[in-house]
């Protein structure tokens, strides 16, 4: 467990969020975090919340400007950017600013109900662990997760076999997830800065290049199961993409978002 031996408390940490035109999601996410601060689950002097607004120019920007308890960075892109690149560059702006050793990456469609999840992940971050996170973005349950792994494993090797025989087949995709996802992940940013690493590298999805690099280092990534993690939080999964893209009311992700928001309001 990461404890200060003199004070017997968990270390200071920061939380990083990137907003782009998602007022409802961002407001819900931040409202829950503020409740945890007000309830004393976090020490406000030991937890910093950083939010980058990616040039939304809408009501979500005005909302963020109205909050005096967050560190707001308003980012102006130099030109057209892919969404993942804009997100990665925004995370790196936070990385440059934070002074704490540990940084939690969150999405604005991640809603934390049980604040002890932050301390639980910090406990799993040992001296040789650079990151802690989950390979899946939602909890499908044990049966669906097992079936998904089996079907992807079967499809992967069927395609490989066909290509070895010279038959026409698609490129086999990895049968299991390779990277922890940034909807809720803890990173040892002190170690990252010491080695000159950032979240957005090689023009790839944020943290993916870094995770590949870690395979060559004597450092590790600790993974937690979705069944365990989702006891503490919910994640819409691409909720921000759905809102910006204008998914219709019947889209499954929009349905999930509305169900989660309804549960929050009822509680």
Model region roles, listed by residue range:
Residues 52-62, 77:
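A conserved acidic beta->alpha catalytic loop
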Residues 11-17, 33, 47-51:
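Hydrophobic targeting segments
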Residues 103:
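Short aromatic/hydrophobic "clamp" motif used to bind/position activated sugar donors
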Residues 22-37:
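Short, well-formed alpha-helical segments that are part of the catalytic scaffolds
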Residues 117-203:
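Conserved catalytic core of nucleotide-sugar-dependent glycosyltransferases
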Residues 59, 110-123:
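Acidic donor-binding/catalytic loop of UDP-sugar-dependent glycosyltransferases
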Residues 199-267:
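C-terminal catalytic/acceptor-binding lobe
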